[in-house]
A protein has these predicted regions:
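Conserved hydrophobic beta-strand within the GNAT/NAT acetyltransferase core sheet
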Residues: 208, 238-241
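Conserved active-site alpha-helix within GNAT-family acetyltransferase domains
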Residues: 93-105, 221, 243-261
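N-terminal ordered "arm"
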Residues: 7-52
Length: 270
């Protein structure tokens, strides 16, 4: 598996991904963030796009590409204990099940899940409603842009790392990213945040996280409305790919329309 290499010229692998509509692919295929790996960069048959925790496999299903450990590669982005694997088609999904459901070294569990995509349509958002949601923050709470201080604070806490975590540093985030947090000013505590998980031409993929101790208070809704409004002001699209039922229901409250569900896998490493 040592001949798996990072693809420097992504134009050579774009054909493998075809017209696959996936919110995380553009960042990789446009060369903005993330990376693509393959066996033969000149005549690739299979490839995987890697960004943050996400792995998107395309082309001819290949077991060695699935087993490749990006932690030991030149991958610039930090890999966590869980990978989210997205297959291009049923053949890839079948190979993923066969490969990781066996007793494979370094893998503790494979969980098959459904994710939910949304329609990309600027006209679906009700700005007045979003402003109403944003202004519903109670007294003592303040919505702040993610500046360098907030960026560093997000990295300090496990629950908020994903808000900014796959950008190289604050300079990289300030150029490509956009985000807000909700601060409890009474104790200077960040309770929730919404930010760009990744960036692509003309848009971002939204990441929303809330401190577990402060969930079910409407904070995610407030942060979600705030970042959508910021994106609309900049003329960029706030893309939303939901990881679970709760996420898609939150998206609907903010104006998104569900497009459909698709199969993905959570791969937990030892």
């Amino acid at each position: 598996m040592s001949n798996i290499v990072k693809v420097e010229d992504v134009e050579k692998v774009k054909g493998l991904f075809g017209d696959w509509e996936n919110n995380f692919l553009p960042s990789c295929l446009q060369g903005i963030m993330g990376e693509v790996y393959s066996f033969d960069c000149d005549n690739p048959k299979s490839a995987v796009a890697v960004i943050g925790d996400f792995r998107m496999f395309a082309g001819e299903p290949n077991e060695n590409l699935l087993k490749f450990d990006y932690k030991d590669s030149e991958c610039d982005y930090k890999c966590g204990e869980m990978d989210i694997i997205i297959p291009q088609n049923d053949k890839w999904a079948e190979l993923i099940r066969d490969t990781f459901n066996s007793d494979l070294e370094g893998v503790s569990e494979l969980k098959e899940i459904k994710r939910y995509s949304t329609f990309e349509d600027m006209s679906q958002f009700d700005v007045d409603k979003l402003n109403e949601i944003k202004s519903s923050a109670k007294e003592g709470f303040e919505i702040l842009d993610i500046d360098e201080e907030i960026y560093n604070r997000c990295l300090e806490n496990e629950w908020s790392k994903d808000l900014v975590g796959i950008y190289n540093n604050y300079e990289d985030y300030s150029k490509k990213g956009i985000g807000v947090v909700l601060l409890d000013t009474r104790n200077n505590e960040i309770v929730s945040g919404a930010s760009s998980y990744c960036t692509f031409e003309g848009g971002i993929e939204i990441e929303i996280d809330t401190n577990e101790q402060h969930r079910r208070n409407g904070y995610a809704l407030i942060c979600g409305a705030s970042i959508i409004l910021k994106c609309l002001e900049r003329g960029i699209y706030p893309s939303w790919d939901a990881h679970n039922k709760g996420s898609i229901e939150l998206a609907k409250k903010l104006g998104y329309r569900e497009k459909g569900e698709y199969t993905a896998f959570e791969l937990y490493r030892k």
